[in-house]
């Protein structure tokens, strides 16, 4: 069984930094983020055109935000947990803009916007040249806005997917929808920011063939976490937090943060 | 090559060993877990008690015993009850009310056993309750108060109502009219058949015992729950009968010493079902009624406000009825009784010596039971004081504690002056003995439990190594192992056992989500189109299945598709039902196409499907008339008016049998043709297609045995089946592998069981179709019909899997031929195909059927071992009789019937037939 399907391979697999592909095949580690390293291919299948793992920007601001935001999200979650249990809908609704701001900051400061940064650095691969820190140009902001629009478009579909996997359909509509919105904001927004609407990239993500990085790790973690969140619901402990959708949201946040941290460090560049 | 063959042989042997060990383990464990309780034989006689005179005179000589099935305590005692007359009797002291605690399993037969023998029936009585014709459940040879009343020879025994009594006491009743509860939609006729006998019998003076057992109230519960609009009118009807009998006792001279007992055999839960041990189910009402009882001056308040726990007045054990009746009617206490004489009645006997006699007789009888159980003669002489300082067993402890009560009885006998509470220590001691003897924990045979456990673990090891040897690459077993291990862990939590369906639903959706996503790799469509056209229909089908019937304990009775969309819209239901039958008809005709000429094929299949459809309509008209729409009634039923349900069902079964035989005939014919004459044309169908005929015939059987509201589920099954089939035919070798098909089949078998309303509770066993076409009880037939009625979905998937396995097998052969580049010559093609088939069967290559068996065996071994471990470790847990024992019985059904008989036996036969 071939690992990569001929169909996908031939048609549209994208290469971020296609120029560099032939020049460098050394495996990079997330620690050595010189300019070149962002152009190297990851993984052993360098002969195939594949998706590269996303590099976090090297600016001090990006590195700070990268570590500070997961902590801030965790703090926010723990702080609002009791309120979430008693009053899920308003709490989730109010938290949504805060989480959106967090994710927006994260994307703008840490992530390469769709297409642009990688190609920019590829066009002038001068060794030793430091990329200008935090150059949030108008185009990146537009990318971020587009990504948030895409995220909100995809939220109803995510809601629908949750219903298909067993979320209540006739009741708890706003609960499930807000939960889907949180999940989309956490896991899909960074991916939209990084990949845009690149169908080949999304095919790789959807087929679980993309290499692990903070964005894809976060997606996998968030989905697995939300999935595992359904496990404690049937228990007869009669706790308030067993109510829909507290455990799902809890699993989504926990899984997302874990997946993002692990995907960005330990498993960076690895594939399933 | 030879290594490969050896590996294949050894894995086959391991697989066989595992499948032999599974039933062995189940039997060994069951004999230790459900021990056979030794019963004292013979009828109790009055034996002289040391120092006492004659047995005290009994205040009553006749008994009217009225059972209202599922009469929960609050139905009689609370403000919104319909029992107004009975409540007035309570206020006047003519009725002494109790809440009688019924132990789990709260189903009729074990409850009647407890009521009549005074003992606690073993859990296996549940199985025998379903298997109603079993001889061993008969009480004809046991000591009961019925046998004692008969032995008194002061009158005849008569019985009107639930024929469970006739099955329990064959030959005991002189006059009887049994009613059956085939159709729970019957609220009135079933009770009218009892009531019409009462006036005549009240005039007769030739009986000393009259049993009445009303089923209507139970039926209303099953149909509409305790708050059904039919409930209070039914209670008023029952109250009217109480009034009728009470007034007869008051006025008629030959009835003046009649004791009238009104009780429920069990209660019901909020959904109107029973079987488990929720407070509602275990709290039936119990009343002793007679004008004579006014003398006790026990006037009590009535009605009472609602109580959450259903405990009203004082609570007694259901088994206490036996010794109390013995005292009140004057006969020896039945030998195996564990009940305690209800102390409220002691003051009927003015003399203390008489009261002491009754208590002492109760104690002595229970001591005999204890001695028999413990195998010692603990109560024969006085125990040495030193052994009482540190008793070695519960029995010894009990014997030591007997000293105090025994002294009290002694003083009461000789007429010493004593305070009014003198009897209390005796009753306390009796209760303690009752508790000890009713507790099951001491009865486990630990060595058998452990031996069964070890055998099951061996089966796990064997099946695991067989699977590793059979399946390549080994890592494709990972999902199966994850499912098996997660399931095993889950078995240790009672709530996960009760809510097992969630595990299968989530696992199935995830697995099929993975399969559909994976399918995108080779799809020629865009991602959204693939999602819309493949992933969405598959996952939506699973979501519909999940919501079809709400099952489990936690949310029992909450709305589901059946309650929200099917029951309120019968037209919609019949549209879907008609579509299901039409679809099956189409497939059946198609599978015979080319074998038999159209002028025969079409009418025969149409007749068969119409017979099945009209049977379903006629059955539903009896079972759930509110679901039958006018159109169905007028067009279909009038068309075949007059045919009885039994005749209709038999017509369907005979038709199915004949067509199945024809299909088998074609298979054998074509097998012979294939062996001798190689020149069968391409257009002619092979046995593989004949197997699909059997599959469609089974679909008709499954429809016949399923509840009407569940029939549309088979349309959903067909959609999922079509998806799996399309996955097999993937062009480039990325299609479904045998292991993946095995996992899909396993998941769908379990998910479909729960989707059709199954659960791990005894109360969810659906008996409504168990007697289709059966007039005289036949254990085998009723057993098969019950199994198909409850496992219709899982068996359907087993059939489907065999057909799909055949598709995989032919696909692999095709690919091998293409791979060897030998696809030029058409003539030798077929020869080779057959040669390869032979080779495959003889072990040159692993047959997909073997891989499938390896998959199901692995899971079955894991589940059996896990359920046994859970039952052993949690054997003293509160839930062992309500959650884990029923789970064990379900696990037995899954592994012995579904796995061994269906997935290995039947599927193996079909695969073998289809592989020629
Ligand atoms: Zn009953
Ligand atoms: Zn019932």
From Swiss-Prot, chain A:
It comes from the Eukaryota. Pathway: Glycolipid biosynthesis; glycosylphosphatidylinositol-anchor biosynthesis. It holds the Pfam family PIG-F. It is a multi-pass membrane protein. Residues 21-48 are annotated as: Disordered. It is found in: Endoplasmic reticulum membrane. The keyword Transmembrane helix applies. The chain crosses the membrane at residues 91-111, 145-165, 177-197, 215-235, 248-268. Its main location: endoplasmic reticulum. The keyword ATP-binding does not apply. Residues 32-48 have a biased composition (Low complexity). Residues 21-31 have a biased composition (Polar residues). One of its GO terms (biological process) is GPI anchor biosynthetic process. GO terms for molecular function: mannose-ethanolamine phosphotransferase activity. Keywords: Endoplasmic reticulum, GPI-anchor biosynthesis, Membrane, Transmembrane, Transmembrane helix. One of its GO terms (cellular component) is endoplasmic reticulum membrane. Acts in the GPI biosynthetic pathway between GlcNAc-PI synthesis and GPI transfer to protein. Belongs to the PIGF family. This is Glycosylphosphatidylinositol anchor biosynthesis protein 11. It comes from Neurospora crassa (strain ATCC 24698 / 74-OR23-1A / CBS 708.71 / DSM 1257 / FGSC 987). The gene is gpi-11.
């Amino acid at each position: 069984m071939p690992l990569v399907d001929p169909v996908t391979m031939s048609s549209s697999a994208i290469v971020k930094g296609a120029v560099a592909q032939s020049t460098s095949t050394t495996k990079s580690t997330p620690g050595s983020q010189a300019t070149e390293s962002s152009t190297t291919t990851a993984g052993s299948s360098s002969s195939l055109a594949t998706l590269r793992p996303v590099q976090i920007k090297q600016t001090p601001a990006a590195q700070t935000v990268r570590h500070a935001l997961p902590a801030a999200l965790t703090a926010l979650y723990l702080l609002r947990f009791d309120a979430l249990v008693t009053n899920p809908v308003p709490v989730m609704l109010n938290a949504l803009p805060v989480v959106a701001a967090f994710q927006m900051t994260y994307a703008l400061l840490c992530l390469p916007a769709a297409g642009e940064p990688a190609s920019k650095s590829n066009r002038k691969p001068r060794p030793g040249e430091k990329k200008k820190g935090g150059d949030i140009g108008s185009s990146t902001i537009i990318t971020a806005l587009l990504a948030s629009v895409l995220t909100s478009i995809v939220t109803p579909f995510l809601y629908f997917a949750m219903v298909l996997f067993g979320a209540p359909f006739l009741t708890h509509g706003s609960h499930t929808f807000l939960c889907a919105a949180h999940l989309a904001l956490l896991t899909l927004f960074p991916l939209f920011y990084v990949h845009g609407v690149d169908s080949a990239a999304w095919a790789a993500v959807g087929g679980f063939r993309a290499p692990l990085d903070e964005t894809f790790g976060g997606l996998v973690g968030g989905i697995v976490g939300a999935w595992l969140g359904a496990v404690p619901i049937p228990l007869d402990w009669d706790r308030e937090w067993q109510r829909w959708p507290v455990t799902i949201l809890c699993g989504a946040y926990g899984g997302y943060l874990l997946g993002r941290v692990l995907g960005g460090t330990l498993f960076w560049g690895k594939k399933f | 090559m030879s290594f490969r063959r050896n590996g294949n042989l050894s894995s086959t042997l391991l697989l066989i060993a595992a499948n032999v060990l599974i039933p062995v383990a189940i039997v060994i464990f069951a004999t230790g877990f459900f021990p056979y309780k030794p019963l004292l034989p013979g009828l109790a006689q009055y034996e002289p008690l040391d120092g006492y005179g004659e047995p005290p005179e009994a205040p009553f000589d006749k008994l009217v015993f009225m059972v209202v099935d599922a009469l929960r305590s609050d139905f009689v005692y609370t403000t919104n009850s319909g029992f107004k007359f009975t409540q007035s009797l309570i206020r006047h002291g003519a009725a002494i009310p109790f809440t009688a605690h019924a132990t789990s399993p709260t189903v009729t037969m074990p409850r009647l056993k407890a009521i009549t023998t005074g003992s606690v029936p073993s859990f296996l009585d549940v199985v025998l309750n379903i298997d109603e014709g079993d001889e061993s459940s008969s009480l004809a040879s046991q000591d009961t108060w019925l046998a004692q009343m008969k032995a008194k020879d002061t009158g005849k025994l008569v019985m009107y109502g639930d024929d469970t009594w006739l099955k329990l006491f064959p030959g005991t009743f002189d006059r009887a009219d049994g009613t059956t509860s085939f159709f729970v939609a019957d609220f009135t006729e079933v009770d009218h058949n009892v009531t019409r006998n009462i006036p005549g019998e009240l005039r007769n003076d030739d009986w000393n015992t009259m049993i009445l057992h009303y089923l209507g109230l139970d039926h209303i519960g099953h149909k509409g729950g305790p708050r059904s609009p039919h409930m209070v009118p039914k209670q008023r009807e029952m109250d009217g009968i109480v009034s009728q009998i009470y007034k007869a006792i008051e006025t008629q001279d030959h009835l003046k010493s009649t004791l009238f007992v009104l009780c429920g055999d069990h209660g019901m839960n909020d959904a109107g079902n029973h079987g488990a041990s929720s407070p509602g189910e275990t709290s039936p009402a119990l009343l002793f009624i007679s004008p004579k009882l006014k003398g006790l001056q026990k006037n009590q308040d009535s009605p009472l406000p609602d109580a959450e726990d259903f405990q009203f007045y004082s609570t007694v054990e259901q088994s206490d009825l036996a010794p109390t009746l013995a005292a009140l009617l004057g006969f020896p206490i039945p030998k195996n009784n564990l009940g305690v004489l209800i102390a409220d009645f002691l003051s009927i006997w003015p003399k203390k010596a008489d009261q002491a006699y009754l208590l002492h007789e109760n104690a002595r009888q229970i001591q005999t039971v204890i001695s028999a159980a413990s195998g010692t003669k603990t109560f024969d002489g006085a125990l040495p004081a030193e052994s009482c300082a540190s008793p070695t067993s519960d029995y010894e402890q009990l014997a030591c504690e007997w000293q105090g009560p025994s002294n009290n009885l002694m003083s009461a006998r000789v007429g010493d002056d004593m305070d009014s509470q003198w009897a209390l220590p005796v009753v306390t001691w009796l209760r303690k003995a009752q508790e000890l003897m009713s507790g099951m924990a001491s009865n486990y045979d630990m060595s058998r439990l452990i031996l069964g456990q070890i055998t099951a673990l061996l089966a796990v090891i064997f099946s695991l190594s067989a699977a590793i040897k059979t399946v390549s690459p080994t890592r494709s077993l990972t999902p199966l192992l994850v499912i098996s291990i997660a399931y095993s862990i889950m078995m240790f939590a009672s709530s996960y056992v009760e809510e097992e369906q969630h595990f299968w639903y989530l696992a199935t959706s995830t697995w099929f989500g993975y399969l559909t996503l994976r399918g995108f790799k080779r799809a020629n469509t865009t991602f959204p189109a693939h999602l819309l056209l493949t992933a969405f229909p598959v996952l939506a089908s699973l979501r519909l299945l999940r919501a079809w019937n709400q099952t489990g304990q936690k949310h029992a009775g909450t709305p589901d598709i059946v309650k929200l969309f099917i029951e309120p819209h019968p037209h919609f239901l019949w549209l879907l039902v008609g579509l299901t039958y039409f679809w099956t008809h189409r497939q059946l005709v198609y599978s015979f196409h080319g074998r038999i000429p159209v002028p025969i094929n079409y009418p025969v299949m149409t007749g068969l499907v119409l017979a099945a459809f009209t049977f379903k309509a006629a059955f539903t008209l009896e079972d759930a008339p509110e679901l039958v729409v006018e159109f169905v009634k007028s067009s279909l039923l009038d068309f075949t008016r007059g045919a009885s349900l039994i005749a209709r069902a038999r017509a369907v079964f005979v038709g199915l049998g004949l067509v199945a035989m024809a299909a088998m005939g074609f298979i054998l014919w074509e097998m012979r043709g294939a062996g001798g004459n190689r020149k069968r044309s391409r257009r002619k169908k092979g046995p593989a297609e004949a197997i699909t005929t059997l599959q469609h015939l089974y679909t008709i059987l499954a429809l016949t045995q399923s509840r009407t509201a569940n029939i549309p589920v088979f349309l959903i099954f067909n959609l999922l089946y079509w998806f799996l089939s399309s996955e097999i035919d993937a062009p480039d070798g990325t299609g479904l592998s045998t292991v993946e098909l095995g996992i899909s089949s396993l998941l769908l078998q379990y998910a479909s069981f729960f989707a059709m309303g199954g659960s791990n509770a005894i109360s969810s066993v659906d008996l409504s179709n168990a007697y289709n076409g059966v007039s005289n009880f036949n254990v085998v037939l009723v057993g098969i019909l019950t199994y198909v009625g409850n496992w219709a979905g899982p068996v359907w998937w087993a059939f489907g899997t065999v057909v799909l396995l055949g598709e995989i097998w032919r696909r692999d052969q095709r690919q091998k031929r293409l791979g060897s580049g030998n696809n030029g010559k058409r003539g030798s093609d077929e020869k080779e195909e057959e040669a390869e088939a032979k080779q495959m069967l003889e072990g040159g290559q692993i047959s997909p059927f073997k891989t499938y068996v390896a998959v199901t065996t692995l899971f079955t071994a894991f589940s059996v071992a896990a359920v046994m471990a859970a039952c052993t470790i949690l054997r003293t847990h509160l839930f062992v009789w309500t959650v884990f024992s029923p789970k064990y019985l379900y696990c037995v059904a899954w592994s012995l019937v579904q796995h061994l008989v269906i997935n290995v036996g039947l599927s193996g036969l079909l695969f073998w037939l289809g592989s020629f």
